[in-house]
């Protein structure tokens, strides 16, 4: 993985990165760095009320941010059975999670990825990163490094040199408490 160390260093320094996911490039940052989160929202021109997804290499990386005690054992098992994979779950959030991550919600969107390059980033960084599509609001999501450079090249985003997966649709989003599908994947 060509520039993994550069990308992890960028995260540690509070910078925004772009990286390939299952279907499109994402942009993200350290979910515990308020300035990095503000920079990400600025790059995306994204309202802070919308919140962000956390993407991780394992459920263990998500535990500091999510409150599984508010879910039943069956609900937790359903979540675990879908991971790693392209299902994002809305789950109860711990109060220590920064409001810029959750937006206007009292829950948080989380996913354990199966994408090897994102897993490598999260493992090397030691925790999850935020995830939202790598595009300016209103434009199509980027599926290549070239497209990321065209849309976000002048924003200072550090781009991970990798390939997106084979998905043509965004990841499915499901509510852990109700089981309802909020977005088809």
From Swiss-Prot:
Entry keyword set: ATP-binding, Cytoplasm, Nucleotide-binding, Nucleotidyltransferase, Transferase, tRNA processing
One GO process term, biological-process aspect: tRNA threonylcarbamoyladenosine modification
InterPro entries in UniProt: DHBP_synth_RibB-like_a/b_dom (IPR017945), Sua5-like_dom (IPR006070), TC-AMP_synthase (IPR023535), TC-AMP_synthase_SUA5 (IPR050156)
E.C. designation(s): 2.7.7.87
Pfam families tied to this protein: Sua5_yciO_yrdC (PF01300)
Keyword ATP-binding (UniProt): yes
Domain YrdC-like: 1-185
Catalytic activity from the UniProt record: L-threonine + hydrogencarbonate + ATP = L-threonylcarbamoyladenylate + diphosphate + H2O
CC per GO annotation: cytoplasm
MF terms in GO: ATP binding; double-stranded RNA binding; L-threonylcarbamoyladenylate synthase; tRNA binding
Localization terms from the record: Cytoplasm
Enzymatic class: transferase
First-listed, main subcellular location of the protein, grouped into a coarse class: cytoplasm
Role summary: Required for the formation of a threonylcarbamoyl group on adenosine at position 37 (t(6)A37) in tRNAs that read codons beginning with adenine. Catalyzes the conversion of L-threonine, HCO(3)(-)/CO(2) and ATP to give threonylcarbamoyl-AMP (TC-AMP) as the acyladenylate intermediate, with the release of diphosphate.
PANTHER family hit by this protein: SUA5 (PTHR17490), THREONYLCARBAMOYL-AMP SYNTHASE (PTHR17490:SF18)
Family per record: Belongs to the SUA5 family. TsaC subfamily.
Name of the protein in its database record: Threonylcarbamoyl-AMP synthase
Native organism: Aliivibrio fischeri (strain ATCC 700601 / ES114) (Vibrio fischeri)
Gene name in the database record: tsaC
């Amino acid at each position: 993985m060509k520039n993994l160390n550069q990308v992890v260093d960028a995260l540690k320094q509070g910078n925004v990165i772009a990286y390939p996911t299952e279907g499109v490039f994402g942009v993200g940052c350290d979910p515990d760095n308020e300035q990095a989160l503000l920079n990400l929202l600025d790059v995306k021109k994204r309202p802070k009320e919308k919140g962000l997804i956390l993407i991780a290499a394992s459920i263990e990386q998500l535990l500091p941010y999510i409150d599984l005690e508010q879910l039943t054992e069956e609900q937790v098992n359903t979540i675990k059975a879908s991971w790693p994979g392209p299902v994002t779950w809305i789950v109860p959030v711990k109060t220590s999670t920064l409001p810029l991550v959750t937006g206007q919600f009292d829950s948080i969107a989380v996913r354990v990825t199966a994408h090897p390059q994102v897993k490598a980033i999260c493992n090397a960084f030691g925790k999850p990163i935020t995830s939202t599509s790598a595009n300016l609001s209103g434009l199509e999501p980027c599926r290549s490094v070239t497209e990321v450079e065209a849309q976000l090249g002048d924003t200072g985003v550090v781009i991970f040199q990798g390939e997106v997966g084979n998905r043509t649709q965004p990841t499915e989003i499901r509510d852990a408490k109700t089981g309802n599908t909020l977005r088809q994947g």
